[in-house]
Each structure stands twice: as C-alpha cells, then as structure tokens.
Design a protein with these regions (language model features):
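C-terminal membrane-associated helical module and adjoining short loops/tails
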Residues: 124-162
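C-terminal ends of transmembrane helices
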Residues: 54-62, 112-125, 162
Length: 162
C-alpha cells in the first residue's frame, strides 16, 4: 500500500470516528452528563466540517473509487445530527413526557427521508427546507429551557420543514 493510499484510508477512518463520537455521546446522555455530551456533539461537527477538505486533499475518490465516502458521510451525519439529538431531547426531558416518544419519532422519520433526497440542496449549495441540524435545535432548547409544549411545537414545525 502506498503512502497516498494509506492517507486516503486514514481520511475515511477520520470520518468514521464520527460513529464512535455519536455512540459515546449517547452513553453520556444516558448518564445525564449533558455538558460533556454537548462537547462531543461539537467534536462531531468539527469532524464533519473538516473531513471533506481532507478527502479532497487526499484525493480519496480517485484513490479508493470502490468505497463510497459520501454514503459513509451520510450515515455518520444521520447519527450525529438526528439520532443523538433525538436521544438528547428524550433524556433531557425537554418534551412533554406523555408525547416525547412520538415527538422524537418525527425528526427521525422526516430526516431519514430528507437525507435520501437527491435534490437536498440548491445550485448554490443552500439546503431546501430545514437541513436536519437537530443538534443545534437540541442545544437551544436546552439552553433556553423553554416550556415543553413550545419545544414540542418547535420539533413538529421543523420536522414538517425537512
């Protein structure tokens, strides 16, 4: 294996580390360590913000054409931007208790469809609809400590926009 090929695989490993970050974040949320969970959510964003640059610099599509880095990216992004924040919303008691399960199902379902849209972005790279950044929503709902019914309406409204 050449050094360039090894570097290309390391970039994919870097992206895949997002899955580990997502899993550890879920564990922290279950333990009610919300501040630590937000730090890891931020780490996931940092990985997501930089892995594409690294992939282009390492020419991963050219060197490893049989590996679909875009699919890996989507899997990791869905975990970090949808599953983890929904788990957070559930365990941080930000939603009405009697409605929390069906409410967190809305972003899970709408974002699953959103992630599969081939035309998710405009020609100038803006998202069509709400771009499934549920981690940001979870952060603001937690920081603002808005009433659970307001949070429920927010989740419902944004799920429709996806």
């Amino acid at each position: 294996m050449t050094g360039k090929l090894a570097l290309a695989w390391l970039v994919h490993l870097y992206t895949a580390l997002g899955a580990v970050v997502a899993f550890v974040t879920i564990v922290l949320i279950k333990e009610l360590k919300f501040q630590e969970a937000f730090w890891l959510m931020s780490l996931a964003v940092a990985i997501d913000a930089t892995d594409g640059t690294f992939a282009r610099a390492a020419r991963v599509k050219e060197l490893i054409p049989q590996f679909d880095g875009d699919r890996l990216e989507d899997i990791i992004d869905y975990a970090n931007y949808v599953i983890v924040p929904c788990w957070f919303l559930l365990h941080a008691n930000l939603l009405p208790a009697e409605d929390s399960l069906w409410l967190v199902s809305l972003p899970l379902l709408s974002s699953a469809y959103g992630f599969c849209q081939k035309q998710a972005k405009t020609g100038d790279n803006f998202f069509l609809g709400f771009p499934s950044y549920w981690n940001i929503i979870a952060f603001y709902l937690f920081v603002l400590q808005s009433p659970p019914w307001v949070n429920a309406f927010t989740i419902l409204f944004l799920s429709i926009l996806v």
